[in-house]
Amino acid sequence: MARIAGINIPDQKHTVIALTAIFGIGRTRARAICAATSIAETAKIKELSEAQIDTLREEVAKYLVEGDLRREISMNIKRLMDLGCYRGLRHRRSLPLRGQRTKTNARTRKGPRKPIKK
């Protein structure tokens, strides 16, 4: 198994699909990485040479992925909460942020129903 950005990449999959195992790299970015490194998208990871894997590592290192990306996302949410803006308040109350209705839906975000105590 090749190790890129601290993640074990699956050997049996095509390069584009295998790169999506890294948090922060989707299909589009994986295709861009393959194009930049001139590695065929359909080539499997086990078929790549060590030099090609190194070029993949260097190209992935240019992007914000895995722990750094998770940290930045959580810091952005924390900043919104500290500002006290509408989105920050919605995060704090665990409610939907983008204007969805909450009277009947939003069960995923709100969690299980809490019974009314009598």
Curated annotation (Swiss-Prot):
Residues 94-118 are annotated as: Disordered. Pfam families: Ribosomal_S13. It comes from the Bacteria. GO terms for cellular component: cytosol; small ribosomal subunit. Keywords: Ribonucleoprotein, Ribosomal protein, RNA-binding, rRNA-binding, tRNA-binding. The keyword Hydrolase does not apply. This is Small ribosomal subunit protein uS13. It comes from Shewanella oneidensis (strain ATCC 700550 / JCM 31522 / CIP 106686 / LMG 19005 / NCIMB 14063 / MR-1).
